Each structure stands twice: as structure tokens, then as C-alpha cells.
Amino acid sequence: MKSMLEKINQLRDVLKHHEYLYHVNDAPEITDAEYDALLEKLREWESQYPELMNPDSPTQKVGASPSTAFKPVTHQVPMLSLDNVFDEKGFLAFNKRVSERLEAESSAQKASLNPLVRDSDQKNRSEKNVQEALTFCCELKLDGLAVSLIYEKGELTQAATRGNGFQGENITHNIRTIQSIPLRLKGKALPQRIEIRGEVYMPQAGFEKLNKQARANHEKIFSNPRNAAAGSLRQLDPHITAQRPLNFFCYGVGLLEGGVLPQSHIQRLMQLKAWGLPVHDRITLCTGAEQVMAFYQEIAQARATLGFDIDGIVIKVDDVLLQEKLGFLAKAPRWATAFKFPAQEKTTQVLGVEFQVGRTGALTPVARLEPVELGGALVSNANLHNADEIARLGLRIGDTVVVRRAGDVIPQIVNVIIESRPQNTVEIIFPHHCPICKSVAKRIEGEAVIRCTGGLFCPAQRKEALKHFVARRALDIEGLGDKIIHQLVDKKYVQNPADLFHLTSEKLLSLKRMREKSAQNLLNSLKKSQKTTFARFLYALGIREVGETTAANLALYFGQLDLLRKADIETLKKVPDVGEVVAKNLVDFFGNEHHQQVISALESVLDWPDPEPIEKPNHPFRDKTVVLTGSLNAFTRDDLKAHLISLGAKVSGSVSKKTDFLIAGENPGSKAQKAEKSGIKIMNEPELIEFLKALKPEGTKV
């Protein structure tokens, strides 16, 4: 029994990890189908061993804890999630459970009716056979973010995420920017207070446009519309949310005070629509299992034409009084379920494999497929990741494979249909030389990827390196998008980043779609970017594993480029956040002859101030380890981090014995508790501001 307990607890931990990634970080590592399979396995084990049930199990919970970036909101009526069914058999089992429970209840004394949902027909309601009365309201299951909207006397006063079902995040300012959500309800007989529940989502066209803009600006690309919607709602600046193409459909009511609603769920939705709230027009009343299955098939076929992502339908008992009789389980209502679509899969043939070269030289195999329509999109390639993945699949060129749109977005090969393998398949062999520059390609010990060793000599790496070099957090060169970079490299106008600063108006005007004004603006941006900082310069070089914080630490520690490029591994490891791997990457980068030439060329065109000497007695943060937590008002986290580093501090992401200070913003969370227990000095934001002011000469700004 002990081994079974260990298995169950291990699976619970895995599910909790993925719940956190999905609900809090908006960065899932597995598909919805894979998560559902894990949860189903846990349910099966807990059913077999009920004595091992734990109230904290993922089967008993709704979602992950709310982020600390927004103020918490407690839901007066819990926002529970739904149980899932995945096929007709599962739906019929749900239908049977509902019918049997209502039949068992019908002989008992009627439960007292909620006066808030009475209407004039309620008292005259005749006795009906349970099966005849059982009508379902069927809706689309949007793949977005569930939200709660509170209207008081018709005015929108609060909006919150679902969070863990009992406590969410206050996102009122961001919700007010969504055009489809009315700030005031229209009509008469509005309730004193009503909670509207619905889904915020991003239409597919808006998602594609958002990612296109992000690529042009060298910003983060969202993996799917759901993540884009969630990330947009969690922006601290509502102006950013206002620029995102978000939409909303409501699907129900939570809290109701001082008002009357119909006893039919679909009639309630029609009432909400009359008040000005958006309700999707494909909601349908279905009597009996046959009609529900017909609706399911209809929506499955229409799915690709909707213009937004759905992953199934939602089936709800329409009669609100019957909903009350059926009640709730720990995490979901008994009267509703989500009938999820299977992951979109089709078979096709692998025509070949090409190898793409990334910024750091990683050779990524991409399968070229016989084009196949999948979820409304024509899929003609799939990322194979690395040699280990190819070996796991046992994949060969010419194989027939099952392709799935993971999370309904990213094409991936699920498995090879071995019985369909022809005799003339070809083994996939990783090249020994880069397919672009012909430099040696080799696999580094301990890594799964094979890399081109050509560095910036490689045109493919050069293009990606240039995109990184001009990005906002690097040299911040406005107007230099991906298409322009590709043309500059292809025309051999730019061989390395230093060549950017020798571009002329004539060369720029020879590029496609380049006009005189755009060319001059780009030249102005290039000139402006020549004045930078040592830290930005180091980050812009694109050295593997050297992010903004590490670049800032290196700049602070060495102060001068000459000292940095002469440093050995042991010296580099003395820098905060630099370990063996990063130190070796730095030594290899600065030891590369081509890189040395590029850096020398950049030194001749860029200018950054020498670091100001930091006197220990005047700067209490010097050589101190500082941790930031909670949401800040006077600073952005990046700006404060950079300022602390400039004062000589080492900024860390976690509290440990080495931590000297904890800077706590609003809703600081567990880091503050740990720091307090460890006796670490904690400063709130006002205290920090006063502390920093005391370090500055009079009249200067923090």
C-alpha cells in the first residue's frame, strides 16, 4: 500500500505542477489532452483506493493559486470548474447519472425553492416524468479565461479571474478596456447586484495579427490564443490590454441579489443578452441524448469556421430547480459536464527532413509533410526538436505518421504507423556540417541538440543574432524588422552587427518596400543606438545563457571589456549568477577569432560610459544579495533590478541564507514569510524609496 501511496502522491505533484504552469504562468508544458489523461489516471487510482483520498488532491480542486501581481478577490459563490467526458460512452454515463439521481429525488420531499429564481410560472409547474423534463442547454466550450463580472444597479464595479475557484485576481481596469463588455447594462428591472460569468478569449485573426506585430518588434510570441488572452488580462498596464484584440461571451450567473431571473438556464442567457451582454448565438436546447450528440457533431464540423478556439461543448441541465436538486461535487456541479473534442489528428506522410539553424547554432530538424488540413489550417511541417525525439518516434523519411495539433495549435508527430512503412524509407541522419555555412556541427556533452560551430560566420546564425542585437532590451534599434534584416544579410550589406552602423541611404533604398522617409528614420535610429551601456552591449552580443541580469552583473563586476574578455573560467565564476556552464560559454565566445573581429568593429562605432566607481561606505547595497517580491508601483521590476545592480547589489530570484535584503511590494507571498522566519531585513517600497533617497545627493532623483 505504501508504494501505491507514493505513486498517487507523485502523480498529484505532477498535476499540481502543470496546473501552476497553466493557470498562473500561462506557459503549459503539456497539451490539454495529456493533462486530462493524467487527471483521469489519478481519479482511477483514487477510486480504487478511497482510503488514500486527500482533500488537497487535484481531483478535488479547481485551478491554481492566483498570481500576486493583482489584489485578491474572494468569490462569494465559488467558481467551480466542470468535469469532462471525452466520447459518447462518457456522455451517456453522465446522462444516466443525472437521470437516476433525479428519479431517486422525485419521491422525496421537494427541496425548498430559492426565492431569487422564482418566476410566475413556478407555482403552477406540473409534475413531469423526470426523463421528459430533462432538457439540456448546450453551449460552446471556449478556450479562453473564465472571469467574473459584478454589476451593481447595472454598473460594472468589479471583475476578477477564476483563480483557484474560491479566490481570484482583481482585473477590473483591464476588463473595462474590452469593447464587448458593457460598462453599464441596459433595460429595466436590473438586479441590485448580479455576478455575470463568462469567458474572455482572443479571436484567431486577432491572435495572428498580434504575433505578427510581436515578431516585427522582436517581442515574445504567444503559443496560442488562450495564452495570449490570459497574458493580456494580466497586464499591469491597462493601456496594453486595451490594444489587445480581446472578446467576451457570458455563459451564466453566479451571485444574484435584489432581482429575479427565469428558472431556465437558456432563458437566463437570453435575459442577459437583452441587458446588453454578449451571448453566443449557437446555444441550443436539446432533449435527450440523441439531440445532444447531434449538436456535438454539428459543432465539431463547424469548429474550423468559428473564428475562435473551442475544445468541446458544455452540457447543462436547463432547469435551474433541477440544478439545485442535483447539487455539486467537490470541484464541479453534478448538473453539467464538458464534452471535449478529441485532439485533432490526421495521418500523412513524411516527405523529407530539413535542418534549421537558430541564433545559438542549434540544428533543429523539421519534418516536411504531405500537406494535410488539420483544425482549419493546412499543416505541411512539424518540429522534430532533436535527435532524441526522432529516436523515440523511430521515425524515417517516407513513414506514414499521425500528426496532431498540440493544444490545437502546434503541429507535432504523435507516432509512426509501422505497419504502413514502405520498403524504401530513409534513415534520418543529422549532418556533420552546418547546412548553411558548412562549419562543423557537433553535439556538446550533456545537451540534446547538435550545434553549428560557425558562430557569427554562419548566415543563418547571423540573421538570428542580428534580430537579437537590435531588440528593444538590447541595442533597441527601431524600424529594423525581420524582413529588412533578411534582405541586408542576403544582399551582403551586413555581415556582422557592426556593419549596421555603416549602412547608407542608397543601400537602404535598394531594399524592397523601403522609402526615403523610412530609410532616414532607420539611419536616425542607428545613430541614436550608438550611445548605449556596457550591460546592453553584452546582452546584445547574444552569448549563450547570458541574459539581461547576467550581462548587468558582468558589466558591474569587470567594468571594462578588456578585463572581461581576458577572464578565465575561475574568475568568471566569481560573478553573481555565473556558474561553470555560463563561464565556459563566455570563454568560448570571446576566444572565437571571428567574434573577436566583430567585437573590435563594434568597439569602434559604439560608445558607452565608463562605470562610476562605487564606494562601499556610501552604498549599503554594495556586495549585498537582494531579492524582489510582490508588485511594485514606483518602479518596474527590471528598472529596480538594474538600479540595485548599479549600486553594487547582487539580485537573486529566491530567498536563501545568502540573502541580505528582501524588497517587498504589494502581495509579497511566500518569499516574505521565508525571509521573516530567517531574520532577513525586509523593506517595503516606501522604505526603499526613502533609503535610496538618503544615498543620493540632495536634489537628484532616485
Curated annotation (Swiss-Prot):
- EC number per UniProt: 6.5.1.2
Its needed co-factors are:
Mg(2+); Mn(2+)
Q: Which UniProt keywords apply?
A: DNA damage, DNA repair, DNA replication, Ligase, Magnesium, Manganese, Metal-binding, NAD, Zinc
Give the reaction(s) catalysed. Answer: NAD(+) + (deoxyribonucleotide)n-3'-hydroxyl + 5'-phospho-(deoxyribonucleotide)m = (deoxyribonucleotide)n+m + AMP + beta-nicotinamide D-nucleotide
Give all residue intervals belonging to the BRCT domain.
616-702
Which GO biological-process labels does this protein carry? DNA repair; DNA replication
GO CC, any one term: cytosol
Q: Specify whether Chaperone is a keyword of the entry.
A: no
InterPro entries associated with the record:
BRCT_dom, BRCT_dom_sf, DisA/LigA_HHH, DNA_ligase, DNA_ligase_AS, DNA_ligase_CS, DNAligase_adenylation, DNAligase_N
The record ties this protein, via Gene3D superfamilies, to: 5' to 3' exonuclease, C-terminal subdomain (1.10.150.20), 6.20.10.30, BRCT domain (3.40.50.10190), DNA ligase/mRNA capping enzyme (3.30.470.30), Helix hairpin bin (1.10.287.610), Nucleic acid-binding proteins (2.40.50.140)
**Membrane-spanning residues:** none
Superkingdom per UniProt? Bacteria
Q: Residues annotated as region Disordered? A: 104-125
The answer, when asked if Manganese is one of the entry's keywords, is: yes
Location of the active site: 141
Write out the residues that bind Zn(2+): 434, 437, 452, 458
Residues at which NAD(+) binds: 32-36, 81-82, 139, 162, 199, 316, 340
Q: Which residues form a coiled coil?
A: none
Task: List the molecular function annotations (GO) for this entry.
Answer: DNA binding; DNA ligase (NAD+) activity; metal ion binding
- Purpose of the protein: DNA ligase that catalyzes the formation of phosphodiester linkages between 5'-phosphoryl and 3'-hydroxyl groups in double-stranded DNA using NAD as a coenzyme and as the energy source for the reaction. It is essential for DNA replication and repair of damaged DNA.
Q: Which family does it belong to?
A: Belongs to the NAD-dependent DNA ligase family. LigA subfamily.
NCBIfam families per record: dnlj (TIGR00575), PRK07956.1 (NF005932)
According to UniProt, the name of this protein is DNA ligase
The scientific name of the source species is: Hamiltonella defensa subsp. Acyrthosiphon pisum (strain 5AT)
Lineage at the top is: Bacteria, Pseudomonadati, Pseudomonadota, Gammaproteobacteria, Enterobacterales
